[in-house]
Amino acid sequence: SEAGSQTADSTAGAATTETATGEPVQASYPLADGDKTITVYMKDATSGAVSDWNNIKAFQAAEEKLGVNIEFIMPAVGSESDQFNLMIASGEYPDVILWDFRSSAMNLEQLVDAGVLLNMDELIRTYAPNYLKVLEGNETFRKEGTADSGEYMALYSFSGRAPVSSGPAIRADLLKEYGLEMPATVDDWTNVLTVMKENGHAYPLTTGQNRDGSVWFELLLSTYDTSNSWCLDPATGEVVYGPVTENFRSYLRQLNDWYNAGLIDPEFMANDGTAMNAKLTDGRSVAGNLMLSYHIANITNAARETNPNFEFVGCPWPVLEEGEEPKLIFINGGQYYSGSQAAVTTACEDPVLATQVLDYFYSEEGNDLLCWGIEGESYTVNEDGTKQYTDNIMNNPDGKTPQEAILEYAIPLYNFSDVILNDSYVQMATTLPEQAAARDTWLDADLSRNMPKLTVASENQNDYSMIMNDITTYVQEMYIQFITGQADLDADWENYVNTVNGMGLENALEYEREAYELYQAR
């Protein structure tokens, strides 16, 4: 049976020594008599939708099982980074910090060196059997959860499948109306977008600004074996910077052709989410790289009030040649399969207990609590062992959306310290059948060209960040100019590449290649 559901020894108190065989200690529950509290500092992933995480029934059930109180401390929504830095500077720490330390001012190793966090390597190897089982079952998880030193510094949360939440999509009802097939090749896309334009859809293909203000037509990046950041050279397997490669120039040339033909929204660089959604809702635009919830669900629900036939369909990632397997190369220089990391601080009086509490959520039982909630109330188990949410969640009597209703019981859309279960995520995130179908279509691609998201060595981090901030800003400016024709892909390309090189690309490339080698050696 799962370690998470063993109750053979009902006496309170956790084992405190490694077993004689050197195997990790299997905890017996409860771990305490309800007289111990573990404080956890973390962002409110629900952005205020949950007023108090201690009221979520999954955590209440876990506390009862473990005999330990879990108390959440959350910085105010909108000022998380500032409050996190103040908490670190204060010297007064909780027992556990759950955070993405890869994006904080100091990373895990630096916080251990500074005396804020414990090096958890021995704690994890001794008291986290469920977590170790997750690492052993997946090579990508193991590498991401391992520091360059070979140590386990924290417990990572993981995503069970490639974290794909957006991809190519087009109006299925219009394909049918105009007698068009689903586009597969770039030539197919050119034809489909042209027919849409001829039928009164002003700018068939659109995009908009990402949260960081950047703008990319992700639709074709993978088609041309490139990325808007670091990627692997398809010929040599070496790390290269996508935006200065010939493949990237070919990608830009295709976008420039579409722009000149009037197939691309001329305001693409200025669209915020509202503007982009408005164009896709009223039919001025009919295709793009769309997100499952923010675009496909929201736009479809709004448009169907006046057009019941309105439907988006997820398309395969475009290819150059008929019959070629679609490729998916994640943008922004690689992809983590892991989210936040849970680390025990030096202020924790019982690090063993804290580790065992965190480890419980990696057991099948603990993970089910976080993803599904309470059996019979928020979910049921089918005869074949699969689970599904109850009507109380999917058709809530109080009018709550499924995403709102589940928060009384569980957090399937927000990782705590769990492996995100694909089934629960899909049932919750994809309430329209076309959303689930789109995600499956986007995942049906060759993912082997992806490089992992890498962490540059601490001593090079400042230099790397300064170089890449300058380069990224310049590349974004030129990207828009090349697409719109303000810059010429023949006359101006060499000067563009030389400018990027002159900003220190060689040094950044060296740091990135070094990080890749260390990752591969883990």
Model-inferred region functions:
Residues 257-259, 276-299, 307-310, 316-326, ...:
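Glycine-rich, aromatic-lined ligand/substrate-binding cores of catalytic
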Residues 1-188, 216, 225-231, 236-243, ...:
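Conserved N-terminal structural module of periplasmic/extracytoplasmic solute-binding proteins
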Residues 121, 147-215, 230-284, 342-353, ...:
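Helix-loop-helix "hinge/cap" segment bordering the ligand-binding cleft or interdomain interface
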Residues 94-98, 204, 286-291:
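Paired acidic/hydrophobic, glycine-rich loop segments that form the ligand-binding mouth/hinge
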Residues 77-81, 188, 271-274, 320-322:
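Short acidic loop-to-helix transition motifs that present clustered carboxylates
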Residues 36, 44-57, 162-169, 176-182, ...:
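Extracytoplasmic/periplasmic substrate-binding proteins
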Residues 61, 291-293, 300-301, 429:
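Long, His/Glu/Asp-enriched segments that create or flank divalent metal/ion-associated functional microenvironments
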Residues 43, 360-480, 486:
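Conserved small-residue motifs centered on glycine
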